[in-house]
Amino acid sequence: MEVGQHGKNYIMSNFPIQKRKLKLAMLGMTEGNGHPYSWSIIINGKYNAQALAKCPYAAIIDYISKQPQNTLGIENAEVTHVWTDDPQDAMHVAEVAEIQNIVSNPKDVIGEVDAVLVATDIGSEHVERCQPFIDADVPIFIDKPLCDNLSDLEIFQKWIDEGKNFISSSAMRYCKEYEPYHQSTHELGDLRYVNVTMAKSWEKYGIHALETVYPIVGPGFESIQ
């Protein structure tokens, strides 16, 4: 069965009786950011313990090894392809997370996967990294921060207006510890000042602070320092 929408045909022969496993590509790695390791493990639900022990990010070794095995893995999704800026990193990520395919160019995954994850945290690079997949209508998850300058934000807004499929977020928005306050802060009284602790640089990690607060207080900030 084919269903056409906006000039495109979507194959639905297995829907809704069967769910086809989504094939994902993990793309990019920048200095100080080990997300390709941890995200691939979390999605695939498996890892090579001996290879993980050689991961250059001690924090990832620590929290992955402490995580109960049955909490890892996303049903009907698998990272099947990986590319990193340094080819040696891709080889190690693939070994750790048992990823089947290493590509020499990120564009090589177009037509091979259902979606890509741009796993880098330099906001000024994200328009360039995402452009080929936007052009090919491949859905994208973009690591935070989405961008760090107004001109790139305007490009992302244009893509939103055009109906392109991408998302970027801090996990802090979804922390269960804050969920009670997403609906009501009445018991806290009138909120006039909010202080949130964040790590490292504002450019890369400030979004964690903002995404913690925004679902609680909503829009209307008068000052941020």
What do the PLM-derived regions correspond to, one by one?
Residues 4-136, 161, 218-219:
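N-terminal glycine-/serine-/threonine-rich beta1-alpha1-beta2 phosphate-ribose binding loop
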Residues 35, 129, 152, 206-209:
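Residues at alpha-helix caps and immediate loop-helix transition turns in enzyme cores, especially N-
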Residues 36, 90, 178, 209-210:
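A general structural signal for well-ordered alpha-helical segments in protein cores
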